[in-house]
């Protein structure tokens, strides 16, 4: 194991071996593998901002498999997306890139002073898809932050 990866893992000594193995999996993948640096392709904007606003300028973006291929060709460390996008390609691309399931999402259909994302996926679903991690957005300081921490 490269020294930098071992150093990063030393910060997670209280975590279980599965979590640590997934960290190694992410940190050793892609063009920056082994450097301790990450480039994660996040594709939740279709949910967050709407598919037309997000993908109309590049129609290939409507296809969830496009993003898997983009992440691979770009040498990304991992690919993060909502449940539907990952379900579309997790089996086809199994083991080719670490996956991160975005477990909550928010839309911008109306302005909110204190947004509260909806839980849209579970840890069980992340495990079923072979994900290395989950992503969960929290808005610290909002009146809903306690609810988000509890989720």
Regions found by a protein language model. Name each.
Residues 1-43:
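N-terminal basic, low-complexity leaders that serve as flexible interaction/assembly modules and, when applicable
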Residues 33, 38-40, 45-151:
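Alpha/beta enzyme core
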């Amino acid at each position: 194991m490269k020294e930098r990866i071992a150093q990063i893992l030393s910060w997670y000594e209280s975590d279980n071996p599965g979590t640590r193995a997934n960290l190694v999996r992410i940190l050793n993948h892609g063009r920056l593998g082994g450097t301790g640096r990450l480039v994660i392709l996040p594709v939740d904007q279709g949910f967050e901002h709407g598919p037309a606003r997000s993908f109309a300028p590049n129609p290939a973006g409507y296809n969830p498999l496009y993003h898997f291929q983009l992440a691979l060709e770009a040498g990304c460390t991992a690919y993060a997306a909502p449940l539907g996008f990952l379900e579309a390609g997790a089996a086809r691309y199994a083991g080719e890139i670490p996956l991160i399931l975005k477990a909550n999402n928010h839309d911008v259909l109306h302005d909110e002073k204190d947004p509260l994302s909806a839980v849209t996926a579970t840890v069980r679903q992340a495990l079923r898809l072979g994900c290395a991690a989950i992503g969960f957005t929290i808005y610290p300081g909002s009146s809903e932050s306690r609810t988000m921490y509890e989720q």
